[in-house]
Amino acid sequence: MNSPGAVDVVIVGAGPVGLTLANILGGQGVRTLIIEERETLIDYPRGVGLDDESLRTFQSIGLVDAILPHTVPNQILRFYDANRRLLAEMAPPDARFGWPKRNGFVQPMVDAELLAGLDRFDHVEVMWGRRMQTIAEDADGVTVEVSGPDGPASVHAQYVVGCDGGRSATRHLMGVSFDGTTSSTRWVVIDLANDPLGHPNSEVGADPQRPYASISIAHGIRRFEFMIHADETDEQAEDPEFVAELLRPFVPHPDRVDVIRRRVYTHHSRIAGSFRKGRMLLAGDAAHLMPVWQGQGYNSGIRDAFNLGWKLAAVVRGQAGDALLDTYDAERRKHARAMIDLSTMVGRVISPTNRKVAALRDKLIRGASIVPTLKRYVLEMRFKPMPRYHEGAVYHAKPPTPASPVGTLFIQPRVDTREQDNVLLDDVLGTGFAVLCWNNNPRTLLGEAAFTRWKALGATFIAARPSTQLHWTKDDDPDVVIVGDRTGALKAFFDAHTESVLVLRPDRCIAGADIAQRAPELSTALFGILHLRQGGENGATGPVLYVPQPTAESSGTVGRAS
């Protein structure tokens, strides 16, 4: 085996998290090597739901237009009781982050687009059919020993990220715990081609006799999931006749369905004791496992990649100190834990097999649906934990105000610029830091010293205005992009907060916010908390990709203002 020599980052695992992370790093000029034990991508669906945050991440790496054809946007999820009476419905209407909150998707096709995206980068490589054997850390980095069909090899890197799944070898070598529970309940998942039902949405049957799920994906694929009883074996659950009987209540001719795959699985609720140990980090299923009920296993992994990617790139390129990577665990652990707890709780609500318990549950849910605020809480998925970082790579004013937007994701409305109408905001912000002011010039507010330092870090400077002022050119600054508030969403945001100057991280989290006059102090605080340095690059090739896209037109999911 030819040794790949030295790279900046080694990623173990070519699943969706590893591929997304590699695209983020590749776009920032970071030399990256993926080591994958399999010979090719997995060709069957695992995850079936994408949320708005994942699509926003794919937008940031320039691949969302390639991915959208493999999705079903605005997918409704309905919950039924044993008599097929509607208990609850999830149909979130807003797209505050630029994309629908619920989307069905075909994972193998999306993963293939993520892999194809790496072809854009000469400095990113995937080694298939190679197993990571050992990791040795020293003062300068890590040495990864790899085995394969043509012999061993070693590669030296600054960091290793384990994206190698629930049985992560990276986590094992780190000596990190993976505490939690594994459910004793088993389920069989059946993926069908040529969808025998054909309708576009999904349902969960909270039937105590046998809870089930029926999920429309894309390209004519439907997934059924059924609970397996204690007296039924795994072998039974994979028998074609047994599967046909499971499908019979839903499909007129279950013996004629086109089965792509069927398998038995259990639900895990686990989280790693640490997401970082020295120069080794974990992401995705290697860091956390959760039940399927909120469709957040896949999406939580993509959040990991987006959170970690920009930080790794900044450290490798010498723009930030190594301590920035400590904020990855501080930020992602709490949110991943909240998602695990929510998914576990929803599973318990859906799957009681005791009829009296199920009847009581049905009464409680129907009673709650009478109350408009509770009904909207479910309909609009307001129960979904949103990232809100109280510590990490964020600066909170002291004392912090309850309404402060710091540590939350910034909205992504459609905006106008002098050059282009009706574009998603992130396509104007670029892929790095951004300083965004309402109705002010960022250079004037920051002062020349802070402005110059942010500019050296590749930041984009945005002056947001009402659309009526878009083409007012007095005091124009060539380093500042003027954005017209096409929909009024930006004005509404700033109207709801006292802060009028925002510093946005590359993952679009609000790193800091304050009133206009305190912008210089805000910058000084953030340079310290984010461990940002002047200068940098340290051998990385530098940012090489920025692909603004007319994305929402192709999705048809975000309303266009005329």
UniProtKB/Swiss-Prot annotation:
Domain of life, per lineage: Bacteria
NCBIfam families, per database record: PRK06183.1-2, PRK06183.1-3, PRK06183.1-5
Protein's GO biological process: 3-(3-hydroxy)phenylpropionate catabolic process; 3-phenylpropionate catabolic process
Name assigned to this protein: 3-(3-hydroxy-phenyl)propionate/3-hydroxycinnamic acid hydroxylase
This protein's UniProt keywords: Aromatic hydrocarbons catabolism, FAD, Flavoprotein, NAD, Oxidoreductase
Entries under HAMAP family matching the protein: MhpA
Pathway the protein takes part in: Aromatic compound metabolism; 3-phenylpropanoate degradation
Species this chain originates from: Mycolicibacterium smegmatis (strain ATCC 700084 / mc(2)155)
